[in-house]
Curated annotation (Swiss-Prot):
Dual function regulator of gene expression; regulator of transcription and modulator of alternative splicing. General coactivator of nuclear receptor-induced gene expression. Residues 1-66 are annotated as: Necessary and sufficient for RNA binding. Residues 1-106, 229-265 are annotated as: Disordered. The lineage of its organism: Eukaryota, Metazoa, Chordata, Craniata, Vertebrata. Belongs to the ARGLU1 family. It comes from Xenopus tropicalis. This is Arginine and glutamate-rich protein 1. It comes from the Eukaryota.
């Protein structure tokens, strides 16, 4: 099935290549015909220039003849009376020259028309002959062209497969590199988070240690204050007892009273 598709595609390619070859052959033949047409056109232009020069030479010759001829005599009625026969012959000769020139121009135009028709017919026949020969040559080389087309198709397939595999390998390498970069980025983020957590834990531990130390200081201060209060209370009670003893006369001599406050450490 694939073989038939490849053959049909090769035939279509073969037909296309045959058309391109025909077009190139036709274009080359048209170029040659165009060059021949230009050559003939230049020849016709040279002929026209030659005719125009001959006409100008004839006119100048006639002017010189008129200037060289003696003036005719004129009668009382204003008519020329001398050399009438020579003038008639001259006029007749001029008419014959005009007719001959006209006939020559007509033949030249006829020849140009015939040459153009021959040129067109030749170009048409050459084009048909070239197309026929190209078609015959393509038909002869049909199998060879098909084999060459199949070879090029297989080569193109191998090249495309190789390029596809290379592209897939490049994509795989790119994906691996991207994955590695993502893993490195995630690892760096984890390390940064761990460092931040460790720093925070250290700060919390330092803060807790400072807080515990402050609490110990506060407890120690409270203990000292409590001890001082107890001492003051004991001293106050002792003094009250002594005052009561004095008041009640239990003692023989009145003791000296002393009050002292200890400053907290």
């Amino acid at each position: 099935m694939g073989r038939s598709r490849s053959r049909s595609s090769s035939r279509s390619k073969h037909a296309k290549s045959g058309k391109h070859n025909k077009k190139r052959s036709r274009s080359r033949e048209k170029e040659r015909v165009r060059k021949r047409s230009k050559s003939r056109e230049s020849k016709r232009n040279r002929r026209r220039e030659s005719r125009s020069r001959s006409r100008s030479n004839t006119a100048s010759r006639r002017e010189r003849e008129r200037a060289a001829s003696p003036p005719d005599r004129i009668d009382i009625f204003g008519r020329t009376v001398s050399k009438r026969s020579s003038l008639d012959e001259k006029q007749k000769r001029e008419d014959e020259e005009k007719k001959a020139e006209y006939e020559r121009q007509r033949r030249i135009r006829q020849q140009e028309i015939e040459e153009k028709l021959i040129e067109e017919e030749t170009a048409r026949r050459v084009e048909e002959l070239v197309a026929k020969r190209v078609e015959e040559e393509l038909e002869k080389r049909k199998d060879e062209i098909e084999r060459e087309v199949l070879r090029r198709v297989e080569e193109a397939k191998r090249i495309m497969e190789k390029q596809l595999l290379e592209e897939l390998e490049r994509q795989r390498q790119a994906e691996l590199a991207a994955q590695k970069a993502r893993e490195e980025e995630e690892r760096a983020k984890r390390e940064e988070l761990e460092r931040i957590l460790e720093e925070n834990n250290r700060k919390i531990a330092d803060a807790q240690a400072k807080l515990a130390e402050e609490q110990l200081k506060i407890v120690e201060e409270q203990r000292k204050i409590h001890e001082e209060r107890m001492k003051l209370e004991q001293e106050r009670q002792r003094q009250q007892k002594e005052e009561q003893k004095i008041i009640l006369g239990k003692g023989k001599s009145r003791p000296k009273l002393s009050f002292s406050l200890k400053s907290p450490d």
